[in-house]
Amino acid sequence: LGDVKLEMKSSDGYNSITIDRVEAIFHDNPSSEDYYSVKLRLLNREMNRDLGLLTDNEPLLNKKSKLDDDFGMDDYEYFGNAYIFNDRTINGKTYTLHLDTYSYSYRQSFYIFSYVVDLYKVTPEYYRFLKSINDAQSNSWADVGLMQVTPTYSNVKGGFGVVAGYNISSVSKFF
């Protein structure tokens, strides 16, 4: 995981909401099919908490389809704010993740704070498990009876659960 930058921007000219964009640069290994999870955390002397991301401006994380939008279905939800993606579209490239969140920088102006980016390289099994949970909790079509509920992935024979693992790389920057 490379450099991390912070950019503050207003969501539009008529809205007072400020968005913080944290950009995190990483390089994907071209010789393997890789699966990732990314988390953004806010850290100061009083708290260490996972933040929800606004995924509209990050193609690797935006799972909402035009059909979902047209019918007013909810946004795709990520279990535990663990935003998962694979390397199919970025294989072997250096990529900049655009992690947008509602601004905490103006609230933290009295404290030194940092955004911490945790990039996890996860096993295919862990990715499938998280994806199945995300798909199940984000399936608005099943909620209204128009689609079948998807089962949760398990690789345990004769039981439930998953045997999987991950490797983490973290970088933080104080602001």
Give residue spans per PLM region.
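A sequence/structural signal for flexible, mid-protein segments enriched
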Residues: 1-175
